[in-house]
Amino acid sequence: MKCIVGLGNPGAKYTNTRHNIGFLAIDALAKEHGIKLTESKFKAVFGTGMIKGERVVLVKPLTYMNLSGEAVRPLLDFYKIAVEDVLVIYDDLDLPLEKMRLRSKGSAGGHNGVKSLIQHLGTQDIKRLKLGVGRPPAPIQVIDWVLMPFAKSEQTTLQHVLSDSVNIATDFIDTPFLALMNRYN
């Protein structure tokens, strides 16, 4: 069984913000594969289904971003999913909106949601799909930028990014991660 986690913040005011691009990616993936995110426990909303013949759980933690690990750890324990079978999708300030990058491990890189996952999962060896949201233009502060909705002028690019993230997450199910990185990075 595989687990794909999108990081974000719960609540309507965060719905289409840059920090919630991980949630947007999970919603797009769920829609593509007909998986309903109707389960609600372990401080998360999630759904299970089949992708490429493999059972998969798609997860959106309902903790705030900085506590994401509190939702993911118990869910992995419940389903007996190994950390190496997890892909985490989240926003990255250091990549422009149209860019994305796969990584098999590493530090949190200043991302508090990833920091929480590393802390609760006990390893930095967490597979990730980082979706670029870009750096804020001056004088906008980072905290304000990531909590801003995407501009109308960014919507077409955002839809392409979400479509690409669906393809990558789908291929994660049956493709060795090194091959996945070679294909998409």
UniProtKB/Swiss-Prot annotation:
This chain belongs to the protein called Peptidyl-tRNA hydrolase
Family statement: Belongs to the PTH family.
> Where in the chain is the site Discriminates between blocked and unblocked aminoacyl-tRNA?
9
The UniProt function text for this chain reads: Hydrolyzes ribosome-free peptidyl-tRNAs (with 1 or more amino acids incorporated), which drop off the ribosome during protein synthesis, or as a result of ribosome stalling. Catalyzes the release of premature peptidyl moieties from peptidyl-tRNA molecules trapped in stalled 50S ribosomal subunits, and thus maintains levels of free tRNAs and 50S ribosomes.
GO MF annotation list: peptidyl-tRNA hydrolase activity; tRNA binding
Q: Name one Pfam family in it.
A: Pept_tRNA_hydro
The enzyme's first-digit EC class, named in words, is hydrolase
A GO biological process of this protein is: rescue of stalled ribosome
Q: Which subcellular locations apply to this protein?
A: Cytoplasm
Q: Does the keyword Magnesium apply?
A: no
List of residues binding tRNA: 14, 64, 66, 112
Catalytic activity field: an N-acyl-L-alpha-aminoacyl-tRNA + H2O = an N-acyl-L-amino acid + a tRNA + H(+)
Q: Which HAMAP family match?
A: Pept_tRNA_hydro_bact
* Record site: Stabilizes the basic form of H active site to accept a proton: 91
Keyword list, A-Z? Cytoplasm, Hydrolase, RNA-binding, tRNA-binding
Q: Which CDD domains match?
A: PTH
Q: What organism does this protein naturally occur in? A: Exiguobacterium sibiricum (strain DSM 17290 / CCUG 55495 / CIP 109462 / JCM 13490 / 255-15)
Q: What is its EC number?
A: 3.1.1.29
| GO cellular component, as recorded | cytoplasm
Q: Would the keyword tRNA-binding be found if you checked this record's keyword annotation?
A: yes
Q: What residues form the catalytic site here?
A: 19
Subunit annotation: Monomer.
